Amino acid sequence: MDVNPTLLFLKVPAQNAISTTFPYTGDPPYSHGTGTGYTMDTVNRTHQYSERGRWTKNTETGAPQLNPIDGPLPEDNEPSGYAQTDCVLEAMAFLEESHPGIFENSCIETMEVVQQTRVDKLTQGRQTYDWTLNRNQPAATALANTIEVFRSNGLMANESGRLIDFLKDVMESMDKEEMEVTTHFQRKRRVRDNVTKKMVTQRTIGKKKQRLNKRSYLIRALTLNTMTKDAERGKLKRRAIATPGMQIRGFVYFVETLARSICEKLEQSGLPVGGNEKKAKLANVVRKMMTNSQDTEISFTITGDNTKWNENQNPRMFLAMITYITRNQPEWFRNILSIAPIMFSNKMARLGKGYMFESKSMKLRTQIPAEMIANIDLKYFNDSTRKKIEKIRPLLIDGTASLSPGMMMGMFNMLSTVLGVSILNLGQKRYTKTTYWWDGLQSSDDFALIVNAPNHAGIQAGVDRFYRTCKLLGINMSKKKSYINRTGTFEFTSFFYRYGFVANFSMELPSFGVSGINESADMSIGVTVIKNNMINNDLGPATAQMALQLFIKDYRYTYRCHRGDTQIQTRRSFEIKKLWEQTRSKAGLLVSDGGPNLYNIRNLHIPEVCLKWELMDEDYQGRLCNPLNPFVSHKEIESVNNAVMMPAHGPAKNMEYDAVATTHSWVPKRNRSILNTSQRGILEDEQMYQRCCNLFEKFFPSSSYRRPVGISSMVEAMVSRARIDARIDFESGRIKKEDFTEIMKICSTIEELRRQK
């Protein structure tokens, strides 16, 4: 029988049909090649938005800089970055007036954080620009390299382990006449292989010392490396994102801590909370506006979009905000917070890898590095690239472009939210002094504006006033991309509101399925995703049960672990059948060993090993949870692991799942090819770093959640801990006298070696 699909929706309220409009199946687009073109676009656009500002020259680096602050007021609707200092300061003052003590309290909270934060905070985060090697590295390695170079240049404050002391070193490093850096390089030579008698390329890794004068060092310290943002859906063009170096990161962290503390106290801020907490917070603002408008007023909501939010923001404005927010605070605190915006006012954008050229006729490919863009003949480029390069050339120094205005993506999300909320705050009647008033929600560059007024003319006037106020603070509401509706229907940060937030379950679809980490983690993540969607996204019991069955099926196909009594033939079926036959209690076998699935929607919160433990044969338990099993390279597993989930839209989310360490929690070995490249030295450093940390955590089992504070080195701490533990164990009879003497001897030897060094 034919079914008319519209019949499916007869009984469904319109807002519940949102999941059927889902366009994002399949993989998101990834970028290939270099991001140089996108970065040049960003730099050129940012300067265009501020073109009527004042040009100055940085005295230290010689970089030309454009300052649009307090520039001409806009006369048209084009996006512009001419924020007015006095307007920003006034908006801050009114924000404080409406929330007495907010800045004071946030400063006190932040001061406490500043004094307690350890330098290992900076090891969080993925790729970081490593100024010592002039390219991207994992954050931990970049930090280790920076500290190593600092110490070899006589900067020792960082040894205390406090972030604030590391930042003192950063400040001092900028005053030094020169800095000496050790870089890795690789030599290639052709040699004849003794066995095959063929010529092969042999690579050797060397380290060389390089001196950077003050100017070169400053340029590197102020450099943001750029990459292309991957996996962005719904965009035709890619765009560039920035990754700052270690000198900037610590200062940014403290500014964002202060801003986060302020955002937590602002009801219109969509940051730093997320998920259901965010929905509740936002629903409150909407409720307030609707309750007040029932009798005499009408209420409209704008689903807002700002044009090029961060390219029109300005670090000088952020400096003004911080100066105001911290005005009654101690000098040292004000200084440390003002450094991040000052560094951003003098930032340099690294243009990435450069351009790739290929000659079809000669089958040649060659890369033009970014450093050459400044003086290469433009006849090799097409028109659009030529225009870009001509525009950017005056700004280039050593392959980086001077970029004073603009913020680059994702740098000061919290602080820019505070700026946005300060405008929403001005919508109260006591400030508009007329019949219309507004309120709304702000989360980084995304906003929703709710305007109330007695009639349509009032609504229009309110929107116009909001639009112009934004212009004064360097925020450009896009008239083309924002749309207005009766209050009750709008979208904000991919949450759709229709008389309440609508669960858009389809957004989560990409995170269903098998993640491909290992059998143990994948099972756990799979059921956790289903559980979370039942809690947060209106995933009903019947659908959840179906999702679970589909997941188990998918899982069995991925790992070729169909039930032991199935007819499906795979390359694992021989072993799995054999295990099935010799197992007494078949219900105790894990799904990944060909066992049955015992999950249903009531027990999704229990890890599979725990669920089946009582049902397992004893020898199976022994094999499954045996840390000495020689066939498994084990990593030590915390009881809770983090998986990164990619929803269809919006930022990647961290999801916790329970991890029980079994022989299925294997870790794939690192790809061998890296060992032949210039990365090898770095890899060895990284492993060394890892080993030291692991050893340290063996001595101080609690160190994973609380770093020891003090001035003794790691080695001293471990030696003294070993002595104390040994004495306690000896006195309580846990170890023999010979062992005790042996331990003491080793400790003395270590100390002796340290003294000699």
From Swiss-Prot:
Q: By what name is this protein known?
A: RNA-directed RNA polymerase catalytic subunit
Q: Which UniProt keywords apply?
A: Eukaryotic host gene expression shutoff by virus, Eukaryotic host transcription shutoff by virus, Host cytoplasm, Host gene expression shutoff by virus, Host nucleus, Host-virus interaction, Inhibition of host RNA polymerase II by virus, Nucleotide-binding, Nucleotidyltransferase, Phosphoprotein, RNA-directed RNA polymerase, Transferase, Viral RNA replication, Viral transcription
Q: Which reaction does it catalyse?
A: RNA(n) + a ribonucleoside 5'-triphosphate = RNA(n+1) + diphosphate
Q: Can you name the source organism?
A: Influenza A virus (strain A/USA:Albany/12/1951 H1N1)
Subunit note: Influenza RNA polymerase is composed of three subunits: PB1, PB2 and PA. Interacts (via N-terminus) with PA (via C-terminus). Interacts (via C-terminus) with PB2 (via N-terminus); this interaction is essential for transcription initiation. Interacts (via C-terminus) with human PKP2 (via N-terminus); the interaction competitively inhibits the interaction between the RNA polymerase subunits PB1 and PB2.
What gene name is listed for this protein?
PB1
Q: Which region ranges are annotated with the description Promoter-binding site?
A: 249-256
Gene Ontology terms: cellular component: host cell cytoplasm; host cell nucleus
Q: What class of enzyme is it?
A: transferase
